[in-house]
Amino acid sequence: MVIESLILTLEIALIATFINIPISFLCAVIATRSNNETAKFLIDIIVSLPLVLPPVVLGYFLLITFSPSGLIGGILDALGFEIVFTKFAAVLACALVSFPLMSRAFIISIQSVNKDLEKIARSLGSSNINTFFTITIRESKFGISGGILLGFARALGEFGATIIFAGNIEGVSRTIPLAIFQSIQTGDDQNLTLLILCSVILGILSVFINNILIQRSKKNKWV
């Protein structure tokens, strides 16, 4: 049970993280480089809402959206696709809950890049796109890496949205947090101890690596 839950947790968190990377990057680019204030405002709402709403509410929104009676779920059901109470449902729940942390880390990291470096590059003939990838991304790479890790760590600990949208199904959606919940309910103290230990170790590793990336990001700044 412990090994199965650990592997499932890592698998779901990794997939959710990879889904979030391009979306978070796009949001960060719009938030930091767009001249359209309306677009920036909408991005701020999109990034902030999942952060302030309870995970169970997010799970409920996913449930009514992707259930066969929902708009998107109805279309998918007609095409023969089932989302609710599947592994992909757990992935979507983890992705939605961890998305704001990754996005905000990307935004802060890109905003912290020295604008003078970008101006110098453009004055030397570099295009905006080339400047963005050779200067902006290069200077913010450790912050972006930290954001990815932060999103991954949040996905590892996701519980509320997952249990509402994906259920607590062994081998399908029973990640470590849900397995801990199950062990508490059944009084399985042996597995409970091992699961909590795994969760703590993963959390410590994530924080440790994230702190290293933050320190490297500070040292990497050009003066």
Question: Model segments located where?
Answer:
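Membrane-helix interface segments
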Residues: 34-42, 71, 86, 116, ...
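Membrane-interfacial helix termini and adjacent extracytoplasmic/periplasmic loops
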Residues: 59-95, 166-169
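Membrane-cytosol interface at the C-terminal ends of specific transmembrane alpha-helices
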Residues: 83-122, 135, 147, 208, ...
